Curated annotation (Swiss-Prot):
Entry annotated with the keyword Methyltransferase: no
Residue numbers of Phosphothreonine PTMs: 124, 126
GO cellular component, one term: mitochondrion
Gene from which this protein is expressed: Fam136a
Stated name of the protein: Protein FAM136A
UniProt source species: Mus musculus (Mouse)
Chain coiled-coil ranges: none
Keywords of the record: Acetylation, Phosphoprotein
Modified residues (N-acetylalanine): 2
Family statement: Belongs to the FAM136 family.
Amino acid sequence: MAEVQQLRVQEAVDAMVKSVERENIRKMQGLMFRCSANCCEDTQASMQQVHQCIERCHAPLAQAQALVTSELERFQDRLARCTMHCNDKAKDSMDAGTKELQVKRQLDSCVTKCVDDHMHLIPTMTKKMKESLSSIGK
């Protein structure tokens, strides 16, 4: 049961990441590469100046990638805390003498609720991420 829930979350997060990459990150990558190419075409610049220029071109993309990574880690941490709470409740039930099958059902139900609750957060997280990405480099 937990594997099914994990797959649901993974597919939703993968779809969100693909959307963000296609609509935001890819454009930023194009800008970064074109900007870097312009740096290299400056025949008057020193090697150090070209390097600094390329670093400046890369900064918005690096900031964007850090933002996406941070948001995904935060989401993952919240989901992990929720499922840990489910595991703790299951262990407490086992310790109290509840039958294993009943504990397994409770655990599955709890994990499903965690996943359902967190699936509802994905659209808001996506919107917030895209808004933040749009403001980077402007």
